[in-house]
């Protein structure tokens, strides 16, 4: 083959390829860049939570205040929060009043705590040099006035559902001393023994009487003193006289003034009254 017809060497396609054909991997994002990219998403979620909670709070506060939700459909967020704060303060006052009524010791604890706080404020104002004298005087005067109002507070006890029963304790004197007791009529159907040894006995005419052991006669076999449910009972003749509850008598030895008290109208003798009495045993 002649030399002029020889093929010229050609460049290889692989060798002629660019050198930057290989792609480099992406660099990982830093923590600050991640926070910046996720901040709008987190802000959107936070606002959604706030709006949802305010919507639920609006429904609850309108139901608690018994207001029509259709008339308050466009309440602002500030209005909802203000209504909630006022409602919670009212609930706190009611709970405090109920606690003071049911437990009087709570008022004493509150007074002690308020007095301690007043002393701390007084001590701080007396040692602090940057407080104006006028402001210090006004503040201490206000706290002293509030403390005086708290000390003067008197909470009335709730009225008792029990019905008062007036009974009399017979003695040697002609005018017995009335005693006021609290007895629930629903619980006085049958004889009951209470703490202290006294017994409540219902009579046949619907009245009640107490049997209280007399400590002056401890040597005798258990004498008791009857107490009368009604101090004055109108006799058939129209005059008023002391009338005992039927069926009451003394145990053991009889006493002279007790024998007179057992007589229904004061005209019968002690023997007649002893025969006509009703003995519960």
Swiss-Prot record:
Pfam families reported for this sequence: Hairy_orange (PF07527), HLH (PF00010)
Placement of sequence motif WRPW motif: 278-281
Signal peptide (residue range): none
Keywords on record: Developmental protein, Differentiation, DNA-binding, Nucleus, Repressor, Transcription, Transcription regulation
InterPro entries: bHLH_dom (IPR011598), HES_HEY (IPR050370), HLH_DNA-bd_sf (IPR036638), Orange_dom (IPR003650)
Induction of the gene: By Notch-signaling. Acts in a complex regulatory loop with other bHLH proteins.
GO CC terms in record: nucleus
Tissue expression remark: Shows a complex and dynamic expression pattern in developing embryos. In neurulae, expressed in the presumptive floor plate, the anterior part of the prechordal plate and in the anterior neural border. In tailbud embryos, expressed in various neuroectoderm derivatives and in the mesoderm, where expression is limited to the presomitic mesoderm (PSM) and pronephros. In the PSM, expressed in an anterior stripe prior to the formation of each somite. Expression in the presumptive neural crest is disputed.
SUPFAM superfamilies: HLH, helix-loop-helix DNA-binding domain, Orange domain-like
GO biological process, one term: prechordal plate formation
Keyword Ribonucleoprotein carried by entry: no
Residue intervals of the Orange domain: 110-143
Disordered: annotated segments: 1-44, 262-281
Comp. bias intervals (Basic and acidic residues): 26-35
Subcellular location: Nucleus
Record GO terms (molecular function): bHLH transcription factor binding; protein dimerization activity; RNA polymerase II cis-regulatory region sequence-specific DNA binding; sequence-specific DNA binding
Domain bHLH span(s) in chain numbering: 34-91
Domain notes: Has a particular type of basic domain (presence of a helix-interrupting proline) that binds to the N-box (CACNAG), rather than the canonical E-box (CANNTG). The C-terminal WRPW motif is a transcriptional repression domain necessary for the interaction with Groucho/TLE family members, transcriptional corepressors recruited to specific target DNA by Hairy-related proteins.
Function (record text): Transcriptional repressor. Binds DNA on N-box motifs: 5'-CACNAG-3'. Plays a role in the patterning of tissue boundaries. Promotes floor plate development and prechordal plate development. Required for lens development as early as the stage of lens field formation, partly through regulation of gene expression of the cell cycle inhibitor cdknx/p27(xic1). A role in neural crest development is disputed.
Self-association state and partner proteins as the record states: Transcription repression requires formation of a complex with a corepressor protein of the Groucho/TLE family. Binds DNA in the form of a heterodimer with the bHLH protein hey1/hrt1. Interacts (via Orange domain) with id3 (via HLH domain). Interacts with the bHLH protein hes6; this interaction may inhibit the transcriptional repressor activity.
Protein name listed in UniProt: Transcription factor HES-4-A
Species whose genome carries this gene: Xenopus laevis
Gene name of the record: hes4-a
């Amino acid at each position: 083959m002649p030399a002029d017809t020889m093929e010229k060497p050609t460049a290889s396609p692989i060798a002629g390829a660019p050198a930057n054909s290989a792609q480099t991997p992406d660099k990982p994002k830093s923590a600050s860049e991640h926070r910046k990219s996720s901040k709008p998403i987190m802000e959107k979620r936070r606002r959604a939570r706030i709006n949802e909670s305010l919507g639920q709070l609006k429904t609850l506060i309108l139901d608690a205040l018994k207001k029509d939700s259709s008339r308050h459909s466009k309440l602002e967020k500030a209005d909802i929060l203000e209504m909630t704060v006022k409602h919670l303060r009212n609930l706190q006052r009611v709970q405090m009043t109920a606690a003071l009524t049911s437990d009087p010791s709570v008022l004493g604890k509150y007074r002690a705590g308020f007095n301690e706080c007043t002393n701390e404020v007084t001590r701080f104002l007396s040692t602090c040099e940057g407080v104006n004298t006028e402001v210090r005087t006004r503040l201490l005067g206000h706290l002293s006035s509030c403390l005086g109002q708290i000390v003067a507070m008197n909470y009335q006890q709730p009225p008792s559902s029990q019905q008062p029963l007036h009974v009399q304790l017979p003695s040697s004197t002609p005018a017995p001393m009335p005693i006021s007791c609290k007895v629930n009529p629903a619980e006085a159907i049958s004889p009951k023994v209470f703490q202290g040894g006294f017994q409540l006995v219902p009579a046949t005419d619907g009245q009640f009487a107490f049997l209280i052991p007399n400590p002056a006669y401890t040597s005798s076999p258990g004498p008791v003193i009857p107490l009368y449910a009604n101090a004055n009972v109108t006799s058939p003749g129209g005059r008023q006289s002391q009338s005992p509850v039927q069926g009451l008598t003394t145990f053991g030895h009889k006493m002279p003034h007790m024998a007179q008290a057992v007589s229904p109208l004061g005209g019968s003798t002690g023997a007649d009254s002893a025969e006509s009495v009703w003995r519960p045993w």
